[in-house]
């Protein structure tokens, strides 16, 4: 017998908040700083959406020695984002989804690699902070599986009692390692094409489709 889903853990960027335009602009800036050879902006965005981090490094011949610089640039972009949060929009249908999940008694969390202060500011701006039990953030961009496992332990949840709702290929790979079922959202970074190849447990096109899964 399948266990009842008790909780949903949401990613933030590209899942709840539409930070994609900001993200893409920063990716282009980073590509220039990394001196990626013969890159075209359209190609960079396309590959970011369809390849894993490891595949991206290989495709653009980026040395892993550049990782500290990349992490530094990502963190700087996140700090800069704080003052732009007022302009970031929530994806259509998310507010209604959160309200319905709460009615069903589903516990809702956020786990993201963004800064906690950015997330809290956005939740309060959109008046949806009351729906979340807790907001977790991680510092390891490529080690989300360990963080997810630790969150489940802290919250007393088992892997078959929870879904992670997210939009990136690295999220899907982390869920596979952690043995957590992921609901992939087609409106985020990887899109339907990118997530299809990672074999996510469910792939949805609209937020309210989640209600059929819990």
What function would you assign to each model-found segment?
Residues 83-110, 116, 120, 145-146:
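Short, acidic loop-to-helix structural element flanking the phosphoryl-transfer center
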């Amino acid at each position: 017998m399948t266990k009842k889903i008790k909780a949903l853990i949401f990613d933030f960027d590209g899942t709840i908040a539409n930070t994609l335009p900001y993200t893409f602009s920063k990716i282009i800036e980073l590509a220039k700083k990394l001196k990626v050879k013969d890159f075209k902006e359209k190609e960079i965005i396309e590959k970011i959406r369809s390849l894993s981090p490891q595949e991206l490094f290989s495709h653009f011949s980026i040395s892993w020695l550049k990782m500290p610089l990349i992490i530094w640039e990502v963190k700087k972009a996140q700090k800069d984002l704080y003052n732009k949060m007022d302009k970031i929009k929530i994806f259509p249908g998310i507010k209604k989804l959160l309200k319905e999940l709460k009615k069903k008694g589903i516990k809702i969390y956020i786990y993201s690699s963004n800064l906690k202060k950015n997330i809290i500011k956005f939740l309060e701006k959109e008046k949806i902070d009351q729906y979340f039990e807790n907001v977790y953030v991680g510092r390891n961009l490529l080690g989300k599986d360990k963080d997810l496992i630790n969150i489940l332990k802290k919250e007393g949840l088992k892997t078959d009692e929870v879904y992670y709702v997210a939009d990136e290929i690295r999220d899907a790979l982390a869920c596979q390692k952690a043995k957590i079922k992921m609901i992939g959202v087609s409106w985020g970074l990887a899109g339907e094409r990118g997530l299809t190849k990672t074999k996510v447990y469910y792939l949805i096109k609209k937020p309210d489709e989640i209600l059929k899964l819990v």
